Amino acid sequence: MSDALKELAEYLSEKRSDDVVSTDVNAMGELSVTVAPAQMVGFIEFLKTDRTCRFSTLIDITAVDYPSRDRRFDVVYHFLSMYQNHRVRVRAAIREEDTLPSISGVHPGAGWYEREIYDMFGILFTGHADLRRLLTDYGFRGHPLRKDFPTTGYTEVRYDEELKRVVYEPVSLVQEYRQFDFMSPWEGAQYVLPGDEKADDKAGETA
């Protein structure tokens, strides 16, 4: 299988040399192709229609946040060719201010994934017919899967019985938020476990 994927990687690099930045087949036998963001639609259309590829099934689209990188986000697409029995991972690395072209014209179902990525990461897809939040409320502040999003969020939502509507309020913690130093030994409560008294008795006899 890995030999077949290596041949496919060479084929894609040759046929779409302007699109492909790099290819890799890892130890698990998975093919990854990094594509120039602006060329994403043309490359994915080629994957779908080329007779050697025939990656007609979009499995999913997701994103990964790498805050320390200049190109902060990886947008990752997974495709399946039921004709060739192959899978391929396609990725594009983009900056925070960059946009990606929507592939919903090639794979109509991609629209839902792109909305989710916009909602969770704030990545914009140009040419999307309805790029709205999907999982959070329309007035939600921030994008929850970014690494710089606070674990408490910015606001909390509750239903107000007096106002008879949902209200947004600043986050109010019932206890102080604790930062743990996981590089240091934990200094917590001292618990007495069954059998500890025997160790104490033995230590007393030795003394």
From Swiss-Prot:
Name listed for the protein in its UniProt record: NADH-quinone oxidoreductase subunit C
Give the EC number(s) listed in the UniProt record: 7.1.1.-
* Top-level taxonomic group: Bacteria
Query: Could you say which residues form the signal peptide?
Result: none
Q: Catalytic activity annotated for this protein?
A: a quinone + NADH + 5 H(+)(in) = a quinol + NAD(+) + 4 H(+)(out)
Keyword set for this entry? Cell inner membrane, Cell membrane, Membrane, NAD, Quinone, Translocase, Transport, Ubiquinone
For this protein, the record's InterPro entries field holds:
NADH_DH_suC, NADH_quin_OxRdtase_su_C/D-like, NADH_UbQ_OxRdtase_30kDa_su, NADH_UbQ_OxRdtase_CS
A GO molecular function assigned to this protein is: quinone binding
